[in-house]
């Protein structure tokens, strides 16, 4: 019974954190509860950040890039911002810049689950299944229970494998 209560409390905490993050509720541990959050939790999200996140919802990737670049000039220690910037560059097909920005996010917050998920998706986009699977293993170690980021990347890896079967060996 005690274990059930502990699990229920953890799930409740995870859900409330996810809801706060989805509503734009600050650092939340660095992008979906990525870890300790570090200095990121003290960053005040300004008009550029908020406009960029509206643009994310509208899939206006060029606007995300413009507004988030302006934001990170003033707030270079915000892992969430670097992650979203990488996301936008990935969506426009600029994988080189996306990889650099995901790297910046993970340097700030090595446990940033959203950055690990998006980095794995970028590796799949680049055709690098091995590195995508490495990000999946990292997410597996970061998530207490299977988290959203792990589940989404796992589904993307599964889809990639079904669309790119291994070549037959001789």
Tell me the role of every PLM-derived stretch:
Residues 43-77:
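Alpha-helical segment of the N-proximal tetratricopeptide repeat
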Residues 84, 118, 152-156:
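Canonical tetratricopeptide repeat
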Residues 74, 108, 141-145:
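Structural marker of alpha-solenoid helical repeat scaffolds
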């Amino acid at each position: 019974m005690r274990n059930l209560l502990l699990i229920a409390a953890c799930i409740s905490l995870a859900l409330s954190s996810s809801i706060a993050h989805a509503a734009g509720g600050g650092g939340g541990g660095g992008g979906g509860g990525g870890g300790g959050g570090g200095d990121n939790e003290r960053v005040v999200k300004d008009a550029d950040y908020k406009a960029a996140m509206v643009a994310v919802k509208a899939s206006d990737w060029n606007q995300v890039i413009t507004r988030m670049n302006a934001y990170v000039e003033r707030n270079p220690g915000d892992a969430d911002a670097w992650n979203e910037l990488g996301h936008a560059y990935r969506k426009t097909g600029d994988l080189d810049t996306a990889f650099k920005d995901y790297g910046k996010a993970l340097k700030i917050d090595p446990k940033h689950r959203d950055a690990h998920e998006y980095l794995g998706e970028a590796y799949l986009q680049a055709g690098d299944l091995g590195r995508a699977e490495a990000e999946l293993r990292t997410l597996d170690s970061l998530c207490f229970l299977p988290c959203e980021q792990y589940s989404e990347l796992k589904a993307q890896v599964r889809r990639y494998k079904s669309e790119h079967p291994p070549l037959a060996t001789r």
